[in-house]
Amino acid sequence: MFVKVCGLSTRESVRAAVESGADAVGFVLTKSPREISPDRARDLLVHVPEGVPAVGVFRHEAAADAVVTAREAGLEWVQLHGSRSPEDVKTVHDAGMQVIRAVTMGAAPVEFETWGEDLLLIDAAVPGSGETWDYSSVRKLGLGARHWLLAGGLNPSNVGAAALEAEAWGVDVSSGVESSRGVKDLDLVRAFVQAAKA
C-alpha cells in the first residue's frame, strides 16, 4: 500500500513519516492551517530521503503559479485541488514536474477520466473536513489497476478497512494524524503508516 502523509510542517513530523515507511510526503503551499512557506518546505526537504516524493499542495492557484512556487521550494511533484482542466496537468508536466490531481466524490463523473496525471487522489465531497464517507463507492468508477490515492476521514483505526472497501492503490492522510488542527501527532503518524501497510 502506497502511503502519503500530507500537511507536514516540522522536521519531527517529516522524520516520523519517512522513518515509519511513508512513500511520499506533502507540504501545503496554499491557504490552510497547515500552510508553510516555500523556504520552510525547502528546509524540510533535507529530511526526506531520495526516492520519496515530496509534494507541494495547491488549491486555487493557477497551475503556472503552482509550478513557480514548487520550484522555489525545491519540489518535483505538484498536487492540484479545485476546479482544474487537462491544460493544468499539461502545464505542470511541461515544467518537468509530476502531478497528483485531486478530485472529490461529489464531482461530475467525467472528472475521473485520466488527464495524464501521474496519480489521482479521490477525496470526500468536502476535502479537508476529516469526515468519513462511503469508501466502497469508489469501486463503481472502474479504476482497475490505475494508480490512485484514497483520502478523506482516514486515521490509524479505519485506514485498513477503508482501503479494502475502496480497493485503493494508496492512501493519503492529513487531519487523521493530528492532535489539533494543523499539528501532527508523531505517534499517530507512525500508527497510520503501520496500519496502512499491515
Regions found by a protein language model. Give the residues of each.
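Conserved N-terminal beta1-alpha1 strand-loop-helix module at the mouth
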Residues: 1-198
